[in-house]
């Protein structure tokens, strides 16, 4: 029987934000598929330290012999409209959600170019495709990450490097629990105590995604099964953006 995700055995994958939620599921799924997975996450690897990213990547390449897959999964949220959001919070969100992925891509590209092959998967959000209230800067950061994916795909496709972007909807993770709790606390008239049910009812499948479902899509994009896919933004949201 052919493996579900061909071509991953023995490959080196870097996954950011790998200690919980979607990142942990991605780490586990790629490991189960035969990858040598290396994670970058707090406290050991603070992605706001942009000038250290290249050295982390180079150390992984020296240890494993290659960099074949990069999953830019780490991200932070912010809640608030434009008037409520200080510039310091804008800078924090853009640093983790856009600048760090940019620097990671810049660091892995020389290694991938040596082998004329590589797959980069960026984890955006359904907010890369649609707007949501009280989420202007987070949504803007994810839309920017999606467009970075498209441009990079055009630049580096001729050299054998693929770039794809996933756009998950609400996923059952600790981050989602924190976001829903804060929304209810700050805007109780808009987000009631049972707003989790409202979010689930807004999907065609009437539920949240599970982290493992997102991880399966990432493994597919990392593998040879998606060898003719690049520059895509793939919703995985239970039909939320189909409306």
Q: What name fits each language-model region?
A:
Residues 19:
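Conserved glycine-rich cofactor-binding loop
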